[in-house]
């Protein structure tokens, strides 16, 4: 009986993974004006490859194969330059554009339809056990170089501009920008 359950479970998992892959490619085509077709995105987008690697590693993490999940996610990081901890929780249609230097911590939670650019960190401000990484709502855009740090909440529809450091919760439908620069 357990073999039948395992086979059924794996069939469902692979069907969901395939659907997630298709949704991730569709999100890239919708969000990146330079993306020309499904095949190009499938073959050449390291952000997409990192997300798929995360989805496999997260499955391994959930079924208690944590060492294997960490080894696999480390390999994905070496190949893509993008580090997503397998314990993080990431929603549907997640898109990382360019991707190099992205770090997403173990207790981060990311909603659906989120887009982040290169060199973004969803990190901790402490090394204490427990929830220490941000929770990001749905339909959020995080610009390149932004750092979102600590156990904070980023509301739905937020846009965080480039190179902003966010250490406090942000309400829904808000734009976060650093102060204007000036010439001395």
Model-assigned labels for residue ranges:
Residues 129:
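Catalytic-pocket segment enriched in acidic/His residues
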Residues 1, 180-181:
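Intrinsic structural disorder
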Residues 1-80:
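Terminal amphipathic alpha-helical/low-complexity segments used for targeting or macromolecular assembly
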Residues 80, 85-86, 91-92, 97-106, ...:
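Left-handed beta-helix
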């Amino acid at each position: 009986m357990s073999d039948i359950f395992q086979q059924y479970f794996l069939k469902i998992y692979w069907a969901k993974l395939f659907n997630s892959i298709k949704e991730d490619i569709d999100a890239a085509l919708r969000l990146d004006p330079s993306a020309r077709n499904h095949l190009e995105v499938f073959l050449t987008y390291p952000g997409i490859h990192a997300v798929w690697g995360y989805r496999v590693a997260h499955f391994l993490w959930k079924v208690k194969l944590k060492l294997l999940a960490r080894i696999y996610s480390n390999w994905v990081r070496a190949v893509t330059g993008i580090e997503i901890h397998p314990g993080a929780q990431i929603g549907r249609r997640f898109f990382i554009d360019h991707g190099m230097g992205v770090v997403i911590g173990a207790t981060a939670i990311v909603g659906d339809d989120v887009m982040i650019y290169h060199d973004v960190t969803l990190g901790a401000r402490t090394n204490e056990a427990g929830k220490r990484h941000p929770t990001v709502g749905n339909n959020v855009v995080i610009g390149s170089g932004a750092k979102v740090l600590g156990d904070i909440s980023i509301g739905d529809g937020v846009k965080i501009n480039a190179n902003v450091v966010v250490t406090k919760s942000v309400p829904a439908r808000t734009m976060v920008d650093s102060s204007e620069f000036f010439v001395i």
